[in-house]
Amino acid sequence: ELKKEAQDYLDGKDMQADAQILPTKGDKKHYPLAFNLLPQIDVLEDSGYSHEEWKMIHETKKIMLNDMNAKDIKVTATCVRVPVPIAHGESVYFTVEDESATTQDIMDAVANFPGVVLEDDIKHQIYPQPINAAGKRETFVGRIRPDYENPGAFNMWIVADNLLKGAAWNTVENAEYLVKMNLI
């Protein structure tokens, strides 16, 4: 659908008229994805969150703490469908207990984590992009920077090939890491 919409746009045709699938196929209303962003992935609930956003919240807690209802980690999400054929991207905001932690401390930790590639060189405009993550199993992290309004808080941009790096592959990698660390 993305490819057809892009061609229709370039040919001067009305993309809206042919939209049939997004944001969800079962809905009455559809929008084109080409040259557009859709802040809805899956069905929107009365809470204002979509199924995909709830899944992201619960899966993060499950992966991090093995408990999708954990209160120890605070997670929220806004999922946006973007016009790329492969890869997901996430803008992540997080806090650390040690408020004296620096951007370099976070970069060092990220760079040493298995399966993660640090791409963070703002002077040379090096940062993760979906087009570069396609076909690779690694997760790419960059644009790490402090939140100057909140000590101990940081932002970063994460990209991975969603066809290769999903919840199942992450589970395998997490298990391998736990075995390596003699934790299981």
What do these predicted ranges mean?
Residues 69-184:
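C-terminal active-site/capping subdomain that shapes the small-molecule cofactor and substrate pocket
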Residues 1-108:
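Active-site-lining helix/loop region of Rossmann-like oxidoreductase modules
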